Amino acid sequence: MKILFLAILICSSLIFPSSSFASHIELKPCVEIAHCVREEWEVNNIEKPFEKIKTFIENTPRTEIVEIDGDYLHAEATSKWMKYVDDLEVSFLPESNILSIRSESRVGEGDLGVNQKRVDLLKSKMF
């Protein structure tokens, strides 16, 4: 009986990788503050906050969602003139109603405040 239980446990771990059970992906901290912004917001009074921010990102010009995994979203925002690509990540923790946002430029030392403006715009659409 123990062998059967162990076999079932091993098989289920092969069929369902541990990442499929993750409900929250922790966003990396900002290493270079000059071109990265990371914030966490309590979204207690907002119905379906992840869906709301996802819809806004889908409708943002020059921004393309490249990955969605449960309550995690990764998008790429391309600048209008120089075509620089910034990474925008959103992760939602439903148990505590915390929405984590991270926006970072891929190149350069600074971003002329673009990432902070992007995060501020998202926040204004949420609240």
How would you name each of these model-derived features?
Residues M1-F5:
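Positively charged n-region of N-terminal signal peptides that target proteins for export
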Residues L6-I15:
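Bacterial N-terminal signal peptides
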Residues P17-F127:
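Ser/Thr-rich, low-complexity intrinsically disordered terminal regions
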